[in-house]
UniProtKB/Swiss-Prot annotation:
Residue positions the entry lists as glycosylated: 86, 155, 188, 224, 481, 500, 583, 696, 736, 802, 965, 1017, 1060, 1099, 1118, 1132, 1237, 1257
Keyword presence, Glycoprotein: yes
Sorted UniProt keywords: Angiogenesis, Cell membrane, Cell projection, Developmental protein, Disease variant, Disulfide bond, Glycoprotein, Membrane, Receptor, Repeat, Signal, Transmembrane, Transmembrane helix
Name used for this protein in its record: Plexin-D1
Annotated segments matching region Disordered: 1-23
Amino acid sequence: MAPRAAGGAPLSARAAAASPPPFQTPPRCPVPLLLLLLLGAARAGALEIQRRFPSPTPTNNFALDGAAGTVYLAAVNRLYQLSGANLSLEAEAAVGPVPDSPLCHAPQLPQASCEHPRRLTDNYNKILQLDPGQGLVVVCGSIYQGFCQLRRRGNISAVAVRFPPAAPPAEPVTVFPSMLNVAANHPNASTVGLVLPPAAGAGGSRLLVGATYTGYGSSFFPRNRSLEDHRFENTPEIAIRSLDTRGDLAKLFTFDLNPSDDNILKIKQGAKEQHKLGFVSAFLHPSDPPPGAQSYAYLALNSEARAGDKESQARSLLARICLPHGAGGDAKKLTESYIQLGLQCAGGAGRGDLYSRLVSVFPARERLFAVFERPQGSPAARAAPAALCAFRFADVRAAIRAARTACFVEPAPDVVAVLDSVVQGTGPACERKLNIQLQPEQLDCGAAHLQHPLSILQPLKATPVFRAPGLTSVAVASVNNYTAVFLGTVNGRLLKINLNESMQVVSRRVVTVAYGEPVHHVMQFDPADSGYLYLMTSHQMARVKVAACNVHSTCGDCVGAADAYCGWCALETRCTLQQDCTNSSQQHFWTSASEGPSRCPAMTVLPSEIDVRQEYPGMILQISGSLPSLSGMEMACDYGNNIRTVARVPGPAFGHQIAYCNLLPRDQFPPFPPNQDHVTVEMSVRVNGRNIVKANFTIYDCSRTAQVYPHTACTSCLSAQWPCFWCSQQHSCVSNQSRCEASPNPTSPQDCPRTLLSPLAPVPTGGSQNILVPLANTAFFQGAALECSFGLEEIFEAVWVNESVVRCDQVVLHTTRKSQVFPLSLQLKGRPARFLDSPEPMTVMVYNCAMGSPDCSQCLGREDLGHLCMWSDGCRLRGPLQPMAGTCPAPEIHAIEPLSGPLDGGTLLTIRGRNLGRRLSDVAHGVWIGGVACEPLPDRYTVSEEIVCVTGPAPGPLSGVVTVNASKEGKSRDRFSYVLPLVHSLEPTMGPKAGGTRITIHGNDLHVGSELQVLVNDTDPCTELMRTDTSIACTMPEGALPAPVPVCVRFERRGCVHGNLTFWYMQNPVITAISPRRSPVSGGRTITVAGERFHMVQNVSMAVHHIGREPTLCKVLNSTLITCPSPGALSNASAPVDFFINGRAYADEVAVAEELLDPEEAQRGSRFRLDYLPNPQFSTAKREKWIKHHPGEPLTLVIHKEQDSLGLQSHEYRVKIGQVSCDIQIVSDRIIHCSVNESLGAAVGQLPITIQVGNFNQTIATLQLGGSETAIIVSIVICSVLLLLSVVALFVFCTKSRRAERYWQKTLLQMEEMESQIREEIRKGFAELQTDMTDLTKELNRSQGIPFLEYKHFVTRTFFPKCSSLYEERYVLPSQTLNSQGSSQAQETHPLLGEWKIPESCRPNMEEGISLFSSLLNNKHFLIVFVHALEQQKDFAVRDRCSLASLLTIALHGKLEYYTSIMKELLVDLIDASAAKNPKLMLRRTESVVEKMLTNWMSICMYSCLRETVGEPFFLLLCAIKQQINKGSIDAITGKARYTLSEEWLLRENIEAKPRNLNVSFQGCGMDSLSVRAMDTDTLTQVKEKILEAFCKNVPYSQWPRAEDVDLEWFASSTQSYILRDLDDTSVVEDGRKKLNTLAHYKIPEGASLAMSLIDKKDNTLGRVKDLDTEKYFHLVLPTDELAEPKKSHRQSHRKKVLPEIYLTRLLSTKGTLQKFLDDLFKAILSIREDKPPLAVKYFFDFLEEQAEKRGISDPDTLHIWKTNSLPLRFWVNILKNPQFVFDIDKTDHIDACLSVIAQAFIDACSISDLQLGKDSPTNKLLYAKEIPEYRKIVQRYYKQIQDMTPLSEQEMNAHLAEESRKYQNEFNTNVAMAEIYKYAKRYRPQIMAALEANPTARRTQLQHKFEQVVALMEDNIYECYSEA
């Protein structure tokens, strides 16, 4: 594509002129708001807007940097650098406004001074060009006489080269005005620029500039009579300037590339008026010439020639300049090669319309496409204002060569002229050069010795290719034998037309880019991806996808759309761009639109009709159309519902392909639809997992034909479209004639036995008669037994009368209706529903005279129907011999309507009554109005009840009664009148041609007749008629043209009523602008609508699309102004606005013309939009809610307004105090002043202060009124009362203070005593615990003493802590018995640790499927899409996410480096999502798959640290907690203990426990007796547990016997022993509850001998102690003790009771005792071993810091939170709370509570927020409040040490991870994990497939096909296999 340059002129002069002066363009929305409103994509047909960037100021130019993927956008006062892909802002620079004057030199000119005032001036960009060779962006604006800057490529905000360059004072740089005056210095003057590449061996780049002259004498020069013109001498119209920044900077922007004025083209001063040049574009062609080829620079421009010039001279010009080529090429002067020729775009086929003004050009490879428009004001401009023409560059070249030949060889003054009269040239006219042979280069580029510059007088002509109104820009691409043309419009739309090779339009589409904003005349394709087009409107930059092919779902639609870009991707069965289709470069893989729909894949199935009862070996498929060879591909025939059979392709044949396919199994045939004898089956050929072509075949069943058509069974069988045969004897339809018996059978439908139609007389109800039924073709069933059926349960016998007649005997039918028709059919006797054919069914009518005939006329009138009825006090049946009754009574007329009619007659008169004739003939000539006959209408006559007749003409006005004569005469009470209606006038007499005008026609007697018509122009009805006696109102239809039309009033479709009525259709009203364009969301703001011809508007309303509430009614002020209250809206947004004028939707005529190009676009958008913003908010100045005011005093309110963007004016505010208005005096942006000038009333009261804006009302305060005397009295009383209260309070305070002092001293003494006791208790407890723990530490064997879980059990417990979709975790162990060593091995089981249990029959397929699925999971693209697809499902709960993450960790455990890369990618997505909201909340919970993956990754990586460093101090802390708890009393029922860290588990009773040292032996253990310490308050179960702990302390807990599995026996003496139990007959009962037995209860002394033994059968009489019912049992404390009131029973009153809170000091005691062990643990966790640094932590923390830096997150608190959430809170807190994940121990509820307190302290230590502690703070936070600051320092030091570690490379980390994988390989069965992951894949298979289809990489690598293969392998038997397993 050739680079081009755009001028900085306004986008459209027509658009600029459309707005009248009072309505200037309103301020634009700020960028963030517009981004919110406009970033959504819009789509229409085959165009799709991908991205938009809104500009607050009008846009001027843009440039593309294809190599860097950058867009540079220039707007008024701003420069933007945007990302090319999404138009996001990368950099920006402010370049205005600046103080400037067009009469002053640029301030960059040294010693420049100016006497004229400089005013703040906006900077309009004129040139924006990229110079990639020097890394520059050339930016020229309208300020400072068109000054240019050289900015840095890649950073538009930085200036790359300072110009003029700075120089030392000793050597000043010479700067001339011509170096500064580059571009035009007026906003509306055009400028184009083009960076010319340097010639080989030459210097730097050059800049070609074309600029409209703005100096003295032009319309752009200031009209101040100043002659000071800096433009003429310094700014030529066309010039080539230096851009060489690597050479002498002092020569930048100079002309002197060669020392001659010929290097510029400057129009002479005297010729400037006649040659005003307006530049459109500058471009190179060819843009990339081959080496040695000539390249040209072109300028497209308009020459505004004045009247008097030659009529034939074209106004649109194309100028060409030669550029140097090759190393030896000389740089020619500009004027040497300059030549211009006219471009003329004129209508063909006899149309003389000329499009003379050039608007936009686009150079294609062979053609120059140009948009032209007619001059403004042309009479035809409204019909077709713009056209597209195409000129061949070859024709341009030929015309130039011919012109130079005509100038120098054989001069022809009518062909070419020298521009010497216009510019400084080399001679006034062409002259013949003798003895000179012009070389081709001279013919193309001229020479110094030849006349120049030249102008070709005859224009190059072209016929319009396309016409449309308001075209502003063009871009063209040649694609797939089509030419795709994109056209911008003045109304902000983009048209896309596709031209064939003959340049004829074959399709068109329209999309709205920014309605109402003209599209800039330059559009460019993305250099990196031609599938996108960049364009610019007045306030937006847009990136448009050239085609949205995916809107077409079939090949026919895709190819038939004739879109140059779209084609059918055969093997992917979708409409795509060619580059989006795999293998599209190969033949037949991609079918373009140019190939036509006939090349679409098609298929024929043979046989196409299949008998359901016949066996078929297979199907033959003939596949035609554009398809690659299917031979060797994986193929199947797909019948739907997952039914597929194998297909085979032997090879191509005769231009198509043949395939063979097995028919689907018979048991899988689809069911036949109801009442149908066939079913159509759609069969598709499936290739590589996709159905690429389909066809239908039919399965038929002849036997169903007879069932579907039972009354024409034989006829339907033999006339069916299938080969069916009729068996007469079986009365059945078969597909094989051999199934019929040998008897003769009919062979054609005409031979079928059938009943013949025979008319039957009506039968009275209940009568008996015989019915004869004639038959035909009876030879096939002569003599067969038949029955007569009438559709009832009752069947009548049929008797053969002869060979062709059957009689139905004694048929009796009944009905309760007036009459009822019964169908008559013959069926085979004893074979229901087997009927003889009845092609024309016989029927029997049964009537009932007693029903439906309330009067005589109706009764006797039934005789015409064959009903034998008579009238005798009612309608009755008469016998066949009874005579007819006589005449009926005279007619009775109840009502007539209407009561009047015109003299011409024709009125439909309706007469209602009784006995109005028995038949029409009775009254046919018997209806009269006076002496005028009224003719009844047969089709409107109702026997006896109603007559509708047409009145005849009357000789004159008359009035008479209506007479009906039906053998007797009846007359009406009302009179009917003949009158003469007249019309006089109509109003209004004019209206818009859009229709909707409500007119009123005045006259007399206009209410007459039955039908009224008002016709406009004799054809179009005036609708919504309403009439009175003197007027008719109706709504005018739409008119075709502005013209007068006659209006005709017709009564009864007769002639027009006399009176000449004329209505004038006028041009429609035009709306040009609305202001303001912002409204509060509540609506009601007055919107002023400006336009023309509003005097014809009767009513107008305003409605808002999508978010608007009810439309609002507007008010017409005059012919140019309308005011409308803005409608309320549902939300804050920008929405299109519609106006309804006279009930018709307003439409701009130009927009309507555009919409006709694409009817879909007619429904899109509106020209006007309203931006809805939040309602304004107000308050009083001091935000008080009550304001006091004394009547008589002046009242001035100061109201504060919150800042908003509504731009409200002072008259839009209404402030009221009660019902009194407050006059607004001062309004600023934030403050409103108002005052009240009238009295508010003297009565004391309260008045609301309300402020109103539109429909929004806000009460901001209440005004309190009161008298001044009353206020003084009230103040005195209040002060007196306050003084008295102060004295009393002072006395009370002194008394209380003395008492409090005494109490405080007493309390201090108590606290000192308590503190002393606590210190002593801690000292003793710590000493004891240290002694015990020292002994324990000595006993621990470093390798075996700590019961660490194996790695695999650590992993399963950590990954699946509670339950997952895989299994519900239960650590259930078999019954254990101690062996001689006192231990029993019981291995914990888990599905992931065992074999994959599936039956052998299923194993091969499933193992292959799992293997393939494993390879998919090891594909990064698949796994990322897979995880995201599942997480998007609403029913994919957190539990499922965690389960999936853990299963993935197990499945990928052998590839931790790959697992880590996946986790990082998912984390990046999570960080992106969190960074956009609140980054500090990231990783706070575990709610996504990646968060659980991170937990698992940390668990794996930290296991070694956990086991080698943290495990021992952690285990010692657990033992210390247990030892400390066991030193005091523990309530076995409630679990509460004397010593604890948790307030909830504190035993708040002072129960003294004494230790007992017991000598215990364990029978069968093989160990000596041990001394075990217990407390005398221990229950026997607690004693057993302590004994078991003593004997099994070096054995894992899972191998311990349980307390209920052993008995404890006390040997009180050598002869006495007792089995000790918690409950027995000796248990004590208190308050109805049994107390558990303790050592004290049994009075077991110190040193007692006990024996413990295993029991064979567990005693189930007593369950777990803590599960006992507290209503029946207790241990230490009755359940009511802790909740009881101070009053107790006498029996309990001896207990010493104190406040329960006093025992909270024991928490401190326990904490102090355990402090050392806790400190050791925290230091182990938060320290770094030099020999084994935490590589994973360093790696992950560095990753977090890198991500934060990428997103500009510099807050250290955020990084601290991320690190804390990822390691301490995610891993260590989990371990601290769950020691059973690490050790094989018993975690009791009490230990769990203590660990929760410790974990909370760890969490607080990692937090950065200060602890807000008070008296109500929980004890678990207060307990370690003093230590938290020290712990925090340790945490921060740990983070700092991690940060200071040497960074890890990816290779080092991968090596570490690989080592971790190797260390624990083969620990888990990954097949089980894969199978469980597959269950999720199966559950969400459609969603996963859709996600894979939507992912380009997945489509390219066919991941969806591989996934389908997994499903195919797994689906057939996975569930059966699992059920068997």
